[in-house]
Amino acid sequence: MKLIQSGSVDKVKEALEGDPSLADYRDPQGLSALMWAVYTGQTAVRDLLLKKRADLGIALDVFEAAATGSEAELHSILSKDAATAQAFSGDGWTALHLAAAFGTPLSAGSLIFRGAKVDAVSQNPQRNQPLHAALALGRNSSTMELLLAHGADPNATQVGGFTPIFSAATANRKDLAELLMAHGANPQLTDDQGKTPADFARERGHEELAIWLEVQPA
């Protein structure tokens, strides 16, 4: 896993040539080498592992397919067993969380169509919902629109009392804050420490956004 985190494609390729079974290596939580590449943002290593696994005939699971935007594989998995749309990974995410964070709107849509719950709470310390994941990492407005259109709560809280708009404020994304507010997000809600999204924006140097957030109605 350290080799993957290093981002060295050549070294990973060399390791795979020496032991092809490493393409399907999983840690004690069941996380594959592929998911580690996704989590650490090593896109070149991710693509190398995807190709190697395809060459070896190693199928993706629903979480890997969702996180890598592998639409054909995801469709095949869900067609055979729609219940996987509501399953949790070894580290506590649903496939919809992963699609929202790392995948594509099409992947998220396929999962919702097959019964994935937009209000599923992760079974890990974050205790968040797919919309939180979309704001924290993916920040794809189309994915957000999809989740909100299917009933995602824009004021849902995760651990710490953070609603999705806190992530928009942190990232200086007024457009995403506006999208959330158009669906009912309250920009004046506070986290467990009594801070508002405007406070988060200001602490990160986004003064213009902070001022704008402060004058928005609750």
Label each residue range with its predicted role.
Residues 14-21, 47-55, 78-84, 109-117, ...:
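Ankyrin repeat domain, specifically the short helix-to-loop turn at the C-terminus of the second helix
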Residues 1, 26-33, 57-64, 87-95, ...:
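Ankyrin-repeat boundary/"N-cap" motif
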Residues 2-8, 36-42, 64-70, 98-104, ...:
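Ankyrin repeat A-helix N-terminal signature
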Residues 100, 117-145, 158:
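Eukaryotic tandem repeat interaction scaffolds
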Residues 1-27, 68-90, 95:
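N-terminal segments that cap or nucleate solenoid repeat domains
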Residues 11, 44-45, 73, 106-107, ...:
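Conserved ankyrin/ankyrin-like repeat signature
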Residues 2, 47-67, 76, 80, ...:
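Ankyrin-repeat-protein effector appendages
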Residues 155-195, 199-200:
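Ankyrin-repeat and related helical/solenoid repeat scaffolds used for protein-protein interactions
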